[in-house]
Amino acid sequence: MIKEIKSLAAAASTLALVSGALLMSSAAYAAEGAGNIEKGKAIAFGRTQGNCVTCHTMDDGESPGNLGPPLIAMKARYPDKAKLRAQIWDPTVANPESAMVPFGKYKVLTEEEIDYLVDYIWSL
């Protein structure tokens, strides 16, 4: 009986440790995600990098363009985040007549910058 109690206590301790570690890693992941979104926003509004606001209407955008579609409800438009990334990387794959710059194909942005940009745009 005492052996069973010790086993149960050990299992409960292990479960508590694992649960605590998961909660801490979830909080760290959320903080990292928020940081990535902020980095992506800086790229989207940066006049020397992504400069999305030149062609797209976006929240917080000053003097937004209207050449491209407004960047709203992006999770509804792109439920698959990978497809949004592919569109930013090379929009001419989906539409050869696209006026949008192929940011990845032409190496306008690095892969990491594209990831940040996708995180931001997908959050809109």
Where are these regions (language model features)?
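Gly/Gly-Pro-rich "capping" loops immediately C-terminal to redox-active cysteine motifs
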Residues: 37, 45, 53-89, 105
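Cys/His-enriched microdomains
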Residues: 50
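N-terminal export/targeting leaders of redox proteins
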Residues: 1-34
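Extended, non-globular alpha-helical segments
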Residues: 2-13, 83-102
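Electrostatic cytochrome c docking/interface patches
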Residues: 27-47
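C-terminal capping alpha-helices of c-type cytochrome domains
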Residues: 87, 93, 105-124
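A general structural signal marking secondary-structure boundaries and capping sites
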Residues: 47, 59, 91-95, 124
